Amino acid sequence: MKVKNSLRSLKNRHRDCRVVRRKGRVYVINKTQRRFKARQG
């Protein structure tokens, strides 16, 4: 999982990327290509 300051570029890496909030943190998840996971921080 990548940790980035801004998720704007990461959510555009694949068409299935979704931005979700969990426990106060912002994540990018991808159900089909799991290597595109990222967390903001």
Curated annotation (Swiss-Prot):
Cellular-component GO terms for this entry: ribonucleoprotein complex; ribosome
Molecular-function annotations in GO: structural constituent of ribosome
Biological processes, Gene Ontology terms: translation
Keyword line: Ribonucleoprotein, Ribosomal protein
Record's keyword annotation contains Ribosomal protein: yes
Keyword 4Fe-4S among record annotations: no
Family: Belongs to the bacterial ribosomal protein bL36 family.
Protein name stated in the entry: Large ribosomal subunit protein bL36
Name of the gene: rpmJ
